[in-house]
From Swiss-Prot:
Family: Belongs to the methyltransferase superfamily. RNA methyltransferase RsmG family.
Protein task: Specifically methylates the N7 position of a guanine in 16S rRNA.
EC number: 2.1.1.-
GO MF term list: rRNA (guanine-N7-)-methyltransferase activity
Protein source organism: Nostoc sp. (strain PCC 7120 / SAG 25.82 / UTEX 2576)
One term under GO cellular component: cytosol
Protein name: Ribosomal RNA small subunit methyltransferase G
HAMAP family, A to Z: 16SrRNA_methyltr_G
Classification via NCBIfam families: rsmG_gidB (TIGR00138)
Main location: cytoplasm
Length: 245
């Protein structure tokens, strides 16, 4: 018996003012099954129970692109989106499922993970998504990626300042970086404001909320690109995390 994901139509509506179509829900289910299968070889995620997967992977991914509970309008119009350090494909694959007019580039430095995501994209027939084996510090200096994206997504594993350095160089003027975080402090606000300013960005919103099933604390930071990023950013691989701005 296959584990079925919950539909949660009411929660989607209440928290994002949106709910998935039948075909999007079917793709969510297919994604879940593929991740469970891939997990046997690759250790992609510890989150495998249906409700937990729905909340911590699907809902969490999409809540980030819905600041103050409204989906970013450019996603429906045809944005160019990049997901940095996508891992098992979050948040980028769920975003690709719901934003069929947008193009999503999924970046990770681990080739095995990207090979697995290629399988997912093929199985789900997600023609609006593509993958790239690289690091943010490298592509941020490449003309085909620098200042080419409308939206940059990153699930923060450390402090926010390196995330600002990974994302802002990739954005066009007016573009939006979304940094997904758990807890957040006022001290971090000061440091990320300083980093963003040096990188041509400004902190537009710090959205704090709780997840709908387990009431876990979440924060999403939204940085707007308001000026060109100086040419020396991003710095070399490893430097942003070792020596944050």
């Amino acid at each position: 018996m296959t584990n079925l994901l919950p539909e949660m139509a009411e929660i989607w509506q209440q928290t994002l003012n949106w709910q998935p179509t039948d075909s999007q829900q079917a793709r969510f289910q297919q994604l879940y099954e593929l991740i469970l299968e891939g997990n046997r070889q690759l250790n992609l995620t510890r989150i495998t129970e249906p409700q937990e997967f729905w909340e911590k992977h699907l809902w969490d991914s999409l809540r980030g692109v819905a600041p103050q509970q409204q989906l970013i309008s450019s996603l429906q119009l045809g944005a160019s989106v990049i997901d940095i350090g996508t891992g098992a494909g979050f948040p980028g694959v769920p975003v690709a499922i719901i934003a069929s007019n947008s193009t999503i580039t999924l970046v990770d430095s681990t080739r095995k993970k990207i090979t697995f995501i290629d399988t997912i994209l093929s199985e789900l027939a997600l023609t609006n998504a593509k993958t790239l084996v690289s690091r943010a510090e490298e592509i941020g200096q490449q003309p085909q990626h620098r200042e080419q994206y409308d939206v940059a997504l990153i699930r923060a594993v450390g402090t926010a300042s390196p995330c600002a350095e990974y994302t802002l160089p990739l954005l066009k003027l007016g573009g939006l970086a979304v940094i997904y975080r758990g807890t957040w402090t006022e001290e971090e606000t000061t440091s990320v404001e300083n980093a963003a300013q040096q990188l041509g960005g400004t902190v537009e919103l710090i959205d704090n909320f709780t997840t709908p099933l387990t009431n876990s604390v979440r924060h999403c930071l939204y940085l707007r690109k308001v000026a060109k990023t100086p040419a020396n950013f991003p710095r070399a691989v490893g430097v942003p995390s070792q020596k944050p701005i």
